[in-house]
Amino acid sequence: MDKKKALDAALSQIERSFGKGSIMRLGQKEGVVEIETISTGSLSLDIALGVGGLPKGRIIEIYGPESSGKTTLALHAIAEAQKNGGVCAFVDAEHALDPIYARKLGVDLENLFVSQPDTGEQALEITETLVRSGAVDVLVVDSVAALTPRAEIDGEMSDSLPGLQARLMSKALRKLTASIFRSNCMVIFINQIRMKIGVMFGSPETTTGGNALKFYASVRLDIRRIGSIKDKELVVGNQTRVKVVKNKLAPPFKQVEFDIIYGEGISKLGELIDLGVKVGIVEKSGAWFSYNSQRLGQGRENAKQFLREHAEIAAEIETALRQNAGLLAIELLENVGADNIENDEEI
């Protein structure tokens, strides 16, 4: 039998059974291969992700220790989506969202839908309903660890219910994946870290909620606080490192560092200076920073203050950095050693 006739017959049978468009050639529609993205609020992280930001229609996992900047990063993504007219929702399972802080990061509270569910099942059903509507662009679940199964809430404190949360997540993700892709909604799961007992070799760290999220996530970001930013004796922010542990859209294992200032969020001006020095756009001579033979200031904080007062120069540096994004991506990949890659695979 002729292969082409057999294929045509099979395709027409599939379309009769499941509807037109249930199967097609990948190159038939140009839009199929295009990836829409939303900025993370960090220029260096957008470059490290390889596609200019977090991809829409995918599952994202952000995990790390306490007070490392997980929720801050998710709120920045919401703010960036809202700037482009996107509809966003926040499922606050931890009941800990601070609206005042969210507003300072640029989130439009009037157009942010918030839910504070009582159980894990309720949280995931709300998530599924919003995703299926096709009207939501970004949905954040904070956090996986707080998605407590109903059986655990109704039971006694002494009850042992192993694997209950992992089964809940596995079932929910099986149902959600297809809807997320069809609706082009980005779902960000914030997760916490736990320690595995009795691990002799490799990293003892693991994330909550079982292994399902690790498989279904297209992007996994490991965010850590690596130091403090001080103004004289007062701590005003955190130095933060983010590793792209998994990336289905570009090469993974890139690593970036940026500042998170208390009450402001990610310091974009600090990133412009750091990235500019890396590619030679901003010159550093001793403690002095300069751009196009114009001195920005002595010391990083003074240079940041100069850019804050001269927004047009900051915009010029950002444009130049975006044009050098390919070169920067290679630099970011080279920063990560083999040891770090081995450790990432353990989590």
UniProtKB/Swiss-Prot annotation:
InterPro entries: AAA+_ATPase (IPR003593), DNA_recomb/repair_RecA (IPR013765), DNA_recomb/repair_RecA_CS (IPR020584), P-loop_NTPase (IPR027417), RecA-like_C (IPR049261), RecA-like_N (IPR049428), RecA_ATP-bd (IPR020588), RecA_C_sf (IPR023400). GO terms for biological process: DNA recombination; DNA repair; SOS response. Its main location: cytoplasm. GO terms for molecular function: ATP binding; ATP hydrolysis activity; ATP-dependent DNA damage sensor activity; damaged DNA binding; single-stranded DNA binding. ATP binds at G64, P65, E66, S67, S68, G69, K70, T71. One of its GO terms (cellular component) is cytosol. PROSITE patterns: RECA_1, RECA_2, RECA_3. Keywords: ATP-binding, Cytoplasm, DNA damage, DNA recombination, DNA repair, DNA-binding, Nucleotide-binding, SOS response. It is found in: Cytoplasm. It comes from the Bacteria. HAMAP family: RecA. Can catalyze the hydrolysis of ATP in the presence of single-stranded DNA, the ATP-dependent uptake of single-stranded DNA by duplex DNA, and the ATP-dependent hybridization of homologous single-stranded DNAs. It interacts with LexA causing its activation and leading to its autocatalytic cleavage. Belongs to the RecA family. This is Protein RecA. The gene is recA.
